[in-house]
Amino acid sequence: MTKDYQDFQHLDNENDHHQLQRGPPPAPRLLQRLCSGFRLFLLSLGLSILLLVVVCVITSQNSQLREDLRVLRQNFSNFTVSTEDQVKALTTQGERVGRKMKLVESQLEKHQEDLREDHSRLLLHVKQLVSDVRSLSCQMAALRGNGSERICCPINWVEYEGSCYWFSSSVKPWTEADKYCQLENAHLVVVTSWEEQRFVQQHMGPLNTWIGLTDQNGPWKWVDGTDYETGFKNWRPGQPDDWYGHGLGGGEDCAHFTTDGHWNDDVCRRPYRWVCETELGKAN
């Protein structure tokens, strides 16, 4: 029995020895695994929280940037509209100023033109007055000379180079103007030189004025018989053209001074001013 007890005890000792060899290691491995998984979870959670914070910050900044951009766009739009309004206002104001300046310039030019015309008329009146005074002086001298011959131009006529000239202030057709001169024992002016043309222009001014030149009966002729072909001429370029497109019937058979002094052929029925001419001492 003692042997059996010893064997049993020996068996228990062996079992204890084997148990000590296998030991309790499985428990720490499980705990280590659990700890490793928890660390990964914490790390993942931390990274997730960090990522969430970053996303929130970026989202917040993006929203702020969008708001700032919207405000900038609105401010730029307002500035653009305001600038356009100011530009339009300045443009409108500039146009008004430009129109006023043009109006003032136009009025000034008109006043200057009126002054020039008044000055020209005044000079003509002065010249006519001087001519009348000379004519009166001439006639008075003739009377004082007990009828001795002294040749003078009539009052209201102007003497130039041995001829007397009368300048109209009204208008007539060419034929009526020629008849008027004939009643004064004169004829429509016959221009034979540049000097005579300048003299007539100085007294008439820039006006359409009949002269004693016509081709109603064929070729161009001066009313006093002065030779046309070899004499002085001052036609406007392209004239005479005997134009029929004026709608008044017939051609253009009578000559006149234009406003620039050149000659032009025109319809004889047009009403223009005229100049009568006669030799000194022949006028009525």
Swiss-Prot record:
Entry-listed glycosylation sites: N75, N78, N146
Extracellular compartment segments: 61-284
Disulfide cross-links: C153-C164, C181-C276, C254-C268
GO biological process terms, semicolon-separated: endocytosis; immune response
UniProt motif Endocytosis signal: location: 5-8
Post-translational modification as stated in the protein's UniProt record: Phosphorylated on a cytoplasmic Ser residue.
Binding site for Ca(2+) 1: V190, E196, E277
Transmembrane segments: 40-60
Molecular function terms from GO: asialoglycoprotein receptor activity; D-mannose binding; fucose binding; identical protein binding; metal ion binding; pattern recognition receptor activity
Annotated residues for binding of Ca(2+) 2: D215, D242, E252, D253
Sites of S-palmitoyl cysteine lipidation: C35
Major localization listed first in the record, in broad terms: membrane
Intracellular or extracellular location(s): Membrane
Role summary: Mediates the endocytosis of plasma glycoproteins to which the terminal sialic acid residue on their complex carbohydrate moieties has been removed. The receptor recognizes terminal galactose and N-acetylgalactosamine units. After ligand binding to the receptor, the resulting complex is internalized and transported to a sorting organelle, where receptor and ligand are disassociated. The receptor then returns to the cell membrane surface.
Subunit relationships: Interacts with LASS2.
Name of this protein: Asialoglycoprotein receptor 1
Organism: Rattus norvegicus
Taxonomic path: Eukaryota, Metazoa, Chordata, Craniata, Vertebrata
